[in-house]
Amino acid sequence: VNDGSSDRTGEIIEDYARRDPRVVPIHHSPNRGVGAAITSGYKRAVADGMEIAAVMAGDNQMDPAYLPALLDPIVEGRADYTKGNRLINEAYRKGMPAWRSFGNSILTFLTKIASGYWQMMDPQNGYTAISVKALAELPLDSIYQGYGYYNNLLVWLNIHNMTVRDVAIPARYGR
């Protein structure tokens, strides 16, 4: 999803789409926010009959090598939604700046209170996967469309009694 980018993102997506029919470009103009971009992608996954939708930002903070680890719990029926967690593994936390770790700790605590997912950590991590079955039950247009999207999505997942699993992935910045 190209959410109103002013760089060459749209052109790059279109180029990939010409070479690979599995790439389906979605463009927002103007920028509508991270939540709106994710919602557009989710709606397209449902419309195209996908079984699982994954979110991996284009800023190189999410290593594609960890995508199978996010998909497996859903494929195996152990989760409806999986999300990356940079905090579970001490070695993975080393790449996270101290100020970001502090802020993440506060947001994690507040999200646990709001969502009811007490075992969950690192709610700001956007490397996620969700079953399309779960998406079909969620009121996608009612979920906050801005930067707090992931936090609000967790609240909605709990309202709909969905199983959420954290998956250990390394923090990756500045690459």
Model features per residue range: what roles?
Residues 41, 59, 131, 157, ...:
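Residue-level signature of catalytic and energy-coupling elements of molecular machines
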Residues 24, 28-47, 52, 64-147, ...:
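Acceptor/aglycone-binding surface of glycosyltransferases and processive sugar-polymer synthases
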